[in-house]
Amino acid sequence: MKIWEDDNQKYIKAMMEKNTTEQNEKLTKRLEEIDFSVLEHIERKETVNERGVFAPLDAVEVSEIEARGAEFKELGLKAIREGKVGAVLLAGGQGTRLGLDRPKGTLNIGVAKELYLFEQLLRNLMDVTDEAGVYVPLYIMTSNINNADTTAFFEEHDYFGYPKDYVKFFVQEMVPACDYEGRIYMESQTEVAMSPNGNGGWFSSMVNAGLLSDIKERGIEWINVFAVDNCLQRIADPMFVGATIAYGCESGAKVVRKAAPDERVGVLCTEDGKPSIAEYYEMTEEMATARKENGDLKYGFGVILNYLFSEKKLEQIADARMPIHVVEKKDRKSVV
C-alpha cells in the first residue's frame, strides 16, 4: 500500500489532489524513497514516554580503579595493539547554540592560539595511539547538513596529523518527522519533514553505509562511541576498555559523579532490572535526592555519552525493534 493510501496519512492524498502534476511526480518519488517503518512504532505507542521501574546501578568507582588500574590498562592496551578497538565520533550536529553556522566540531576553543574541537579530540585519541604504538580506526558520523563541511574541514587541516586511511565518514540516517499519532509532517508541497534517527541509530547508519565490512576486515571487536561535545574525554581509553573486558561485560559506560541532586544530567541506572538511562527530567525528586549510607547519591552516576560496545553484540541486536524516544521539536508544522 502506498503511504498516501493509509487512512492515517489521508491529508497527503488531499494535498496531492491540489498539487500540479509536476509537484506530484516529485512528491511521489520522494515518498517512495523514504523508509516509513518508524511510523509503526508510533502508531503502536512503542515509545519510552512511559518508563519502567528505576533502581540504582553499581559502577566501578575510583577506589577500585586505583587498586586494579595497572591490570585494566594492560588489558586495554593489549586489545588496542591487537587491532580489536575502533572508535565512533558522533558529530552530526551544527554549532548553532554556540553561534556557529557550521559543524560543531569546527569550533575554535583555543585561547592563545587556534585549537579546534575536532583537533583536540584527535589529540586525545593520539595520546592513546602513541602509547599503544598503533592507530585506532576512527569512524565519524556526520549529517546531511554538515557532511560536506566536515569532510572538507578535515581535508583542509590534513586530518590533524591522523592517518587518513584510519578515518572514515558516514552520514546519519534520517527518519520522517511525525506527530504523536504517526501522521507525517510536511516541509512543503513536495518535501517530507525529516529528522536524524537519534544517537541509537549510529550503528545501523554505519551498516547501511557499508562500513560493517571494514570493521570485519580490520578485526574490530570493541567500539568506543563518543560525542563531539566533550573536549576533555579520553578516547579508546585503555583503562576503560580493560575494565569492561575484565568484568566480562558486553558494554560499558563512562560516567561522572553528579555534583548536586538537581544537576541537569541523565544518570545510569536499571529499568525493570536492565541497564538504562534516566534523563534528569524523568527523575522524581525522591530519586534525585536519595542517598546511600555513606552520603553519596543513589542515582549519582551522570552519563557523558562515552560508551564501549561489543561489536558482536551490536550485530546481534542490530535488527531488534527498539522503543522510540520521543523528542519534541517546536519548529515542525504541516503545510496542509
PLM features per residue range, with description:
Residues 2-167, 176, 185-203, 212-213, ...:
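N-terminal glycine-rich phosphate-binding loop and ensuing alpha1 helix
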Residues 43, 106, 110, 118-121, ...:
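Generic alpha-helix signal with a bias toward terminal, lower-confidence helices
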Residues 92, 143-144, 172-173, 208-209, ...:
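Fold-independent oxyanion-binding glycine-rich loops
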Residues 159-160, 164-263:
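Conserved beta-loop-beta/alpha segment of the NTase-like Rossmann-fold superfamily
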Residues 215, 219-224, 232-236, 241-334:
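Catalytic core of tubulin tyrosine ligase-like
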